[in-house]
A protein has these predicted regions:
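Amphipathic alpha-helical packing segments from all-alpha helical-bundle domains
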Residues: 32, 72, 77-124, 136-143, ...
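Hydrophobic alpha-helical connector segments
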Residues: 22, 26, 36-62, 87-90
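Short, hydrophobic secondary-structure boundary micro-motifs
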Residues: 67-72, 159-162
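Residue-level detector of well-ordered alpha-helical segments, enriched
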Residues: 23, 48-52, 66, 108-112, ...
């Protein structure tokens, strides 16, 4: 129970599909904005990709419920959610573009996005926040996944990557 009457909910949303679409878009919109901002900052592609993976994993680990699981529901494949699919494709493409700057044309450029999304499988869905958002630190899981994303590309880990990434995330948030 969320404390909202059905009539009130349908006053704002014409259908269950619209409610779900709004929820889906709310999970990908902040990440898409952050990814776009990080991709344009003045930093090496290795640092930008590392920061993007860490930032996205950080977001996936910062909610009470595992909203990333919504992406896996069969209904999401429906054409009714085309707007969401476009946003998610843009996010995926940003990961791929930065990885391509590091590796060139190589199928491994698809992997950093999927490594990041593994945070969904690595966290509980029991109403607890695994890693509250912090401007001072990144969750250990986010660091591990970001390291893995660069390792799979055969890229060097940037020096002082955690502090530099926190600064990049802060810069992106301020834009």
């Amino acid at each position: 129970a969320v404390g909202i009457r059905q009539a009130s909910l349908y006053y704002h949303f014409p259908s269950k599909t619209e409610i779900f679409l709004t929820l889906l878009k709310s999970t990908v919109a902040p990440s898409t904005v952050l990814a776009g901002d990080l991709s344009t900052l003045d930093a090496s592609p290795e640092l930008r990709l590392w920061a993007l993976v860490a930032a996205e994993a950080r977001l996936l680990l910062s909610t009470k419920w595992n909203v990333g699981r919504l992406y896996q529901l069969p209904i999401v494949a429906s054409d009714e959610f085309e707007e969401y699919h476009g946003q998610r494709a843009a996010l995926t493409n940003t990961f791929r573009e930065i990885a391509t700057e590091i590796l060139g044309a190589d199928p491994r450029t698809e992997l950093p996005f999927h490594i990041t999304m593994s945070a969904i499988e690595m966290r509980p869905n029991d109403g607890t926040v695994p890693s509250p958002l912090s401007d001072e630190s990144l969750p250990d899981t986010a660091i591990m996944l970001a390291d893995a994303a660069l390792a799979v590309l055969g890229a060097e880990l940037p020096a002082d990557r955690v502090n530099q990434s926190l600064q990049l995330i802060k810069q992106a948030d301020e834009r």
